Every structure is written in structure tokens, then in C-alpha cells.
From Swiss-Prot:
It comes from Candida albicans (strain SC5314 / ATCC MYA-2876). It is a multi-pass membrane protein. One of its GO terms (cellular component) is plasma membrane. Its main location: membrane. It is found in: Cell membrane. The lineage of its organism: Eukaryota, Fungi, Dikarya, Ascomycota, Saccharomycotina. Required for high affinity copper (probably reduced Cu I) transport into the cell. This is Copper transport protein CTR1. The chain crosses the membrane at residues 90-110, 208-228. Residues 157-173 have a biased composition (Basic and acidic residues). Induction: Expressed in limited copper conditions. Expression is positively controlled by MAC1 and TYE7. Induced during biofilm formation and contact with macrophages as well as by alkaline pH via RIM101. Expression is down-regulated by 17-beta-estradiol.
Length: 251
């Protein structure tokens, strides 16, 4: 009887140990399954986020204009926030680009006006005169008459007319009354010259970016503004008898 009691006690202890092992194993399996589910959910959310980001990135690339179009709605121009949602806003951007293109052309006239009229820069006048004479000689060679005496008379008359011209008199007076500028005046003039070299290029490249939006409204604003500005600048140069400088490569 005592043996049976001991045997029953051993059986009870083994059953309790087995149940403890089983419960521990099930707990470990539950933790592993929970970890796997969390990992899968996080990977799924990250993949979905990447997919959405890729779709947004692709849609932004698809929205870029690759040819001339009349569509302008919510399309950025040069800056991120410079865009038009209505026709009135598009017209406002048109006026802005027209004014910038016009001003870029007029700055060339301002530079020539300051050098020749305001500052009376003799070196600038001589360089511009040499460029204009050289281009004139390349384009139209002198025509010789039948008689040498007549040709000499024509050349002498032209030289006399040039000497008696008001531009020649102003240049001669400026050379005779030329005074050395102070250091402050020289530095201030050089700063203005530097600004008149940088600002037109800044406007030109900004207008190029605006034209590269391939929007007809903004494209014609740049073209018309630049053309009108060039026309007005040339008319003012003729009015003030300012010599034209060499043509600029940029718009």
C-alpha cells in the first residue's frame, strides 16, 4: 500500500511538471506569434508608405510640362509659391515677367548712358567708337571713284565732317577738361558697374527658367517684354546719340 501511495505521488508530480512545461511552451509560442505579427504589420505599413511616396513622386514628375501648352493652373514659375489658380493671377504673372524682361533690356541703355553722358568716360567712348568703326569697315568697304582726285576730296570731306561733328567736339572738350576722380568716386562707379553686370544676367537666367515652364502665357511675356525693351533702348540710344556696344549673348 505504501508503494502504491508513493507511485501515485510520483505520477502526480510528473503530471504537474508536464503541465508546467506545456504552459511555458504555449506562452513562448504566443510571444513569438505576437512578435511576428508586429513585424509584419510594421513592414506592411512601411511598404505602403514607400509606395505612396513613390506614387506622389511619380505624379509630380508626370505633372511637368514637356512641350508648349496653354495650361497654367497651379504650375510654379521660378519659385515654389509663384503660381496661378485663376486667369487674373496668370495675367499678373504675365505683367511681372514682361516688366522684368523690359527692365533687363533697359539696363543696357542705362549702362551706356552713364558711361557716355553722365560720367563722360573717354576710354569707354574710344572703345565703343573703335568697335563701331571696325564693324562698319567689315560690312561696307570703301567705294573708289573713277578719278583719284575725286576720291581724295570725298575722304577729306568725310574727315572734316567727323571733326566738326558735335560728338567729336564733346570728346575733345572732355579730354581737355578731364580731371582725376577721387578714390571714393571711382569705387562707387565700379560698384554701379558691377551691379549693372550682375543684375541683367540675374534677370536673364530667371526669365530663361520662366520660359522653360513651357506655358504659352509666360513664354510670350518673356519674348514680348524683351522685344519691347530692346526697341525702346535702341530708340533712346539714337535720341541721345549713344554708341551701341557689342551685342550680348544672353537674352
Amino acid at each position: 500500500m505504501e508503494f502504491l501511495k508513493r507511485h501515485e505521488g510520483h505520477m502526480h508530480m510528473s503530471d504537474s511538471a508536464t503541465s508546467m512545461v506545456t504552459s511555458a511552451t504555449s506562452a513562448v509560442m504566443d510571444m513569438a506569434s505576437a512578435t511576428m505579427s508586429m513585424t509584419m504589420s510594421s513592414s506592411t505599413s512601411s511598404s505602403s508608405g514607400m509606395a505612396m511616396e513613390g506614387m506622389d513622386h511619380g505624379s509630380s514628375h508626370m505633372a511637368m510640362n514637356m512641350w508648349l501648352t496653354a495650361s497654367f493652373k497651379d504650375y510654379p514659375v521660378v519659385f515654389k509659391d509663384l503660381r496661378a489658380s485663376t486667369k487674373a493671377q496668370a495675367f499678373g504673372i504675365f505683367v511681372l515677367l514682361f516688366f522684368v524682361a523690359f527692365l533687363a533690356r533697359m539696363l543696357e541703355f542705362v549702362r551706356n548712358y552713364l558711361e557716355e553722358i553722365v560720367w563722360k568716360n573717354n576710354n569707354y567712348a574710344e572703345v565703343e567708337q573703335g568697335i563701331s568703326q571696325h564693324s562698319a569697315n567689315l560690312q561696307s568697304p570703301p567705294v573708289k571713284s573713277c578719278c583719284d582726285d575725286n576720291a581724295k576730296e570725298v575722304v577729306s570731306d568725310e574727315s572734316i565732317d567727323k571733326q566738326n561733328s558735335p560728338q567729336h567736339e564733346e570728346t575733345t572738350k572732355a579730354r581737355g577738361t578731364g580731371k582725376s576722380l577721387s578714390l571714393a568716386s571711382t569705387i562707387s562707379r565700379d560698384i554701379i558697374r558691377l551691379a549693372l553686370c550682375i543684375i541683367p544676367d540675374l534677370f536673364a537666367y530667371s526669365l530663361m527658367l520662366a520660359a522653360m515652364t513651357y506655358t504659352l502665357t509666360y513664354f510670350f511675356a518673356v519674348v514680348i517684354g524683351s522685344g519691347v525693351g530692346r526697341f525702346v533702348a535702341e530708340r533712346l540710344m539714337e535720341h541721345y546719340r549713344i554708341k551701341r556696344g557689342p551685342p550680348r549673348n544672353c537674352c
